[in-house]
Structures are given as structure tokens and as C-alpha cells.
């Protein structure tokens, strides 16, 4: 991430054509967002949130307000500002647009689930529904949305839902999905990590719940690192 930021900081966006400048600001936001997810120090995390917000403002100043990309970045800005209800409203507006393709609609459902998670336990069920719908639509479109399945599994693990026993099944589907649709390097990495984690905990039946949580977290970290996560 530091290397990516150094490269971005070496570029003067004002010297780029407008379309490339938009891309520059979006890449900058993505890099900052990735860094905040890996950063435990609140001081540095806040610093990169501020940087992401600054680039969001720069992007919004260039994009037309009636474009779906404008609304997408605006929703992300609301999310960073912890204005979660506005973020939810904007994402729902995006989903109703005719120019939003089905696979993007599935991604927006996933983001919606993430925002609902920020609102606390009272919204956990709504978040679970959004993740589930996102996963279903994604599978219908024959595309991978592994994090949706993993989040569903993790939510089920930590709930008294009558379907909690399906948590490991969701995680299994996510891993197998990676094996089928991912490139060989990514698939092998996810699969070996997953089965290694299971193996070292196999004899600890009483720790089954904890095992699944570790598996979900480890696989999630690898997927984020490998670029599956955006929002």
C-alpha cells in the first residue's frame, strides 16, 4: 500500500485528461480504503479516511450528478463520514436505476449489507438478508462474490438463527467457488489455507465454532489482499 501511495503521490492529477483524472481519484480512494482495513492505529486510519474523502470530493467535482458512478462514490463518501442512513438511501437509489447492470446490482446489495452491519446488532438480520440476496444473484449470474458467502457464514455462526448449522456449508461453497472460478494460484492459496486451518483444529470438536470463525476470517483476509473487496 505504501508503494501504491508513493506512486499516486508522484502523479500530478491536474496534468491528466479529465477521464484519467477520474480514474486517478477512484484508484486513490481504493488504495486508501484498503489501507484503513489493515490499519489498527486509529490515528493513521483516520488519516487515510481523510485522504479518501478528499479524493472522493475531487471525483464528485468532475463527474456529472446524474451518473451512476457519481452516486456510487457519493454513497462511499457517506459511508466514510458514518452517515449510514444516507449511504443506504443512495445505494437503494442506485439499485433502481435502469443503467445499473445486474452484476453491479448484486455488488450494491453486498455493500448495503456492509453498511447495515455498521448500524449494530438490531440490523444484523437485514444485513444477512442483503448478503444472502447478493450471493444468490451472483451465483445466478455465474460470477463469484465470495465475501458475500463468507459474511453470511460468519453471521450465522454468531447468531441463534435456526439455519446456523449451515454456516460451514456457506463457507465451503465460497471456497469451492474460488477453486472453480479463480485462477490456479488464487484457488490453491485459498484452498490450502482453508484446509490447513481445518486440519490443525480437527481434533478439537468442542472448538468447532471458533474454528469456523478463524477459517472465515483467514479466507476473508486473503480475498481482500488479492483484490476481491472494494467497499
Whereabouts are the PLM-identified features?
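A "functional boundary" signal
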Residues: 1-205
Amino acid at each position: 500500500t505504501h508503494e501504491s501511495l508513493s506512486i499516486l503521490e508522484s502523479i500530478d492529477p491536474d496534468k491528466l485528461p479529465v477521464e484519467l483524472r477520474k480514474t486517478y481519484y477512484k484508484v486513490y480512494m481504493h488504495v486508501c480504503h484498503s489501507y484503513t482495513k489493515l490499519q489498527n492505529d486509529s490515528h493513521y486510519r483516520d488519516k487515510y479516511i481523510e485522504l479518501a474523502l478528499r479524493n472522493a470530493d475531487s471525483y464528485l467535482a468532475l463527474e456529472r450528478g446524474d451518473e451512476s458512478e457519481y452516486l456510487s462514490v457519493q454513497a462511499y463518501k457517506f459511508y466514510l463520514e458514518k452517515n449510514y442512513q444516507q449511504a443506504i438511501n443512495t445505494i437503494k437509489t442506485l439499485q433502481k436505476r435502469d443503467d445499473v447492470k445486474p452484476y453491479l446490482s448484486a455488488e450494491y446489495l453486498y455493500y448495503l449489507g456492509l453498511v447495515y452491519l455498521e448500524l449494530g446488532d438490531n440490523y444484523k438480520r437485514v444485513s444477512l438478508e442483503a448478503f444472502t440476496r447478493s450471493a444468490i444473484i451472483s451465483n445466478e449470474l455465474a460470477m463469484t462474490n465470495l465475501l458475500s458467502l463468507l459474511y453470511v457464514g460468519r453471521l450465522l455462526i454468531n447468531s441463534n438463527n435456526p439455519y446456523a448449522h449451515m454456516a460451514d456449508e456457506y463457507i465451503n461453497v465460497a471456497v469451492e467457488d474460488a477453486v472453480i472460478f479463480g485462477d490456479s494460484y488464487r484457488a490453491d492459496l485459498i484452498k490450502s489455507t482453508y484446509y490447513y486451518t481445518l486440519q490443525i483444529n480437527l481434533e478439537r470438536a468442542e472448538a468447532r465454532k471458533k474454528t469456523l470463525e478463524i477459517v472465515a476470517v483467514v479466507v476473508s483476509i486473503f480475498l481482500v489482499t488479492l483484490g476481491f473487496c472494494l467497499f
